[in-house]
Amino acid sequence: SHQCCEDFALMRSIPGMVVICPADGVEAEAAVKAAYKYQGPVYLRMGRLAVPVFHEDGFKFKIGKGEIMREGTDIAIIANGLMTYEAIKAGEALEAIGIHARIVNMSTIKPLDEELVLKCAKECGKIITCEEHSIIGGLGEAVCSYLAETYPVPVKRIGVNDKFGCSGTAAEVLKAYGLSAEHIVEVTKVFLNR
């Protein structure tokens, strides 16, 4: 099936458009309810891969607000969609080797939770973004654009590197693009040593 890797970029460029990519089924349901109540256009991307649910039933989704899933101060890993689960797994693996990564679920790409991004930059000093999207125009670029003008810190983007989407099982596609917890761990170790 078709793999769209540029939808966030296209939707972010439309004035007034809200762009959301929930991390699990509970958040997806809450995001649909929030989108229904929102007075304006909303683009809501749903992934095809089932991921474990880590939000509690009754979770209240707030457009434009991210959430810290795991505390840490060595580095912040900001993710959305199914990559949030991969980032959480990476955070656990990094903790086991003494790296304390803050994991952030940033389901709203536009408007970006600039307050939380700034907090991560100030408290962690380095940021990695993770998304199932092109590194051009998505979450990583939104974070970089904001920080370049407010509080420049090193940022590494993990995503699809300027390629068209490919077909295969979800696991095959994620592996082909390096969108896995294992890859996040390796990138984090290298990035922290720069």
Indicate residue ranges for each PLM-predicted region.
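Thiamine diphosphate
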Residues: R45-R194
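Glycine- and acidic-residue-enriched helix-capping/beta->alpha junction motif
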Residues: A35-P41, V143
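Conserved thiamine diphosphate
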Residues: S1-K37, L192
